[in-house]
Amino acid sequence: LGLKEPLAAGKLSPETFPQLLPQTVLMAVEDLYDATSFVAGKSAEWGIDPARIVACGSSAGAITVLQGAYFIANENPLTAKLPDGFDYAGVISFAGAVVDMADDLTWKRAPAPIMLFHGDADSNVPYRALRMGGAGIFGSDYIARQLSDMKSPYYFYSVEGADHALATVPMNNYRDAIDQFLTQQVGERLPGHDRHEGALFQQPAAR
């Protein structure tokens, strides 16, 4: 959304993109938090448990949910839009990343359990880290290594040679793994630091 006007005006370029990207992501997270607060506010009416809300997104949506988890972990002022003390029960990202103006991601505390899918040949969203013009885009591989160091629960399914197809393929092909993550690491809060290497259409092995 934040890139539409500069694009239409012909002002989007490799030079301006790093300055525009953080604000664009901020707008997306603001929408995510507004939607989350709306759902949490309807919890009694809809019969849901706000403590079990999972954020899930693909590509730009995956960047949004990961950024949302990163902001919560770091007590970003934007989290004031959320109910007091709120955190997601889990986060599922299909080819996502976190954007930060720093040279590295810094987590004040561990985030909610995170499930990551990404191909290492993705040219749309960086698999590792890309720094450009003062902005850093930190992909799934980079995030998974940090979560491992923090001993924060995560599941990373990495596919060698795969492109941005991992933004969509897992929704249909890896449902068993997703269900297992939701059951064990989100529902039962079991510890887990799992990294799997696989083929694009290969079902992850049961744990």
Q: Model-found features: residue ranges?
A:
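C-terminal catalytic histidine-bearing segment of alpha/beta-hydrolase fold enzymes
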Residues: 145-207
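Primarily recognizes the serine-hydrolase "nucleophile elbow" in alpha/beta-hydrolase
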Residues: 30, 34-110
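Soluble non-cytosolic domains of exported or imported proteins
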Residues: 22-30, 134-138, 169-172
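The feature captures the conserved acid-bearing segment of alpha/beta-hydrolase catalytic domains
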Residues: 79-151
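Serine-hydrolase catalytic machinery in alpha/beta-hydrolase-like enzymes
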Residues: 1-48
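Solvent-exposed, polar/charged alpha-helical surfaces in well-ordered, non-transmembrane soluble domains
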Residues: 30-37, 41, 141, 145, ...
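Solvent-exposed loop/turn segments at secondary-structure junctions
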Residues: 1, 60-63, 96-100, 121-124, ...
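Short, solvent-exposed loop/turn and secondary-structure capping segments
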Residues: 4, 66-68, 103-105, 126-129, ...
